[in-house]
UniProtKB/Swiss-Prot annotation:
This is ATP synthase subunit c, chloroplastic. Keywords: ATP synthesis, CF(0), Chloroplast, Hydrogen ion transport, Ion transport, Lipid-binding, Membrane, Plastid, Thylakoid, Transmembrane, Transmembrane helix, Transport. It is found in: Plastid, Chloroplast thylakoid membrane. It comes from the Eukaryota. F-type ATPases have 2 components, F(1) - the catalytic core - and F(0) - the membrane proton channel. F(1) has five subunits: alpha(3), beta(3), gamma(1), delta(1), epsilon(1). F(0) has four main subunits: a(1), b(1), b'(1) and c(10-14). The alpha and beta chains form an alternating ring which encloses part of the gamma chain. F(1) is attached to F(0) by a central stalk formed by the gamma and epsilon chains, while a peripheral stalk is formed by the delta, b and b' chains. It comes from Nephroselmis olivacea.
Length: 82
């Protein structure tokens, strides 16, 4: 086992989780802010806005989970590290 490959796998796993969390984090903050603004403008549409927001947040969170899966694969199922 090459120590360089093992170190690169750990660095890549950290980058995978970190970079996969940036986009959805920004998107979730923006979506929540827009939803609060929409509810403030139209309180009667609160239920519809909230349902759409929760569905959107679930899809955004899936992207972060994909990054976590890639990181776990790099750490524990890496074919280059024996």
């Amino acid at each position: 086992m090459s120590p360089l490959i093992a170190a690169a796998s750990v660095v890549a796993a950290g980058l995978a989780v970190g970079l996969a969390s940036i986009g959805p984090g920004i998107g979730q903050g923006t979506a929540a802010g827009q939803a609060v603004g929409g509810i403030a403008r139209q309180p009667e549409a609160e239920g519809k806005i909230r349902g759409t927001l929760l569905l959107s947040l679930a899809f955004m969170e899936a992207l972060t989970i994909y990054g976590l899966v890639v990181a776990l694969a790099l750490l524990f199922a890496n074919p280059f590290v024996s």
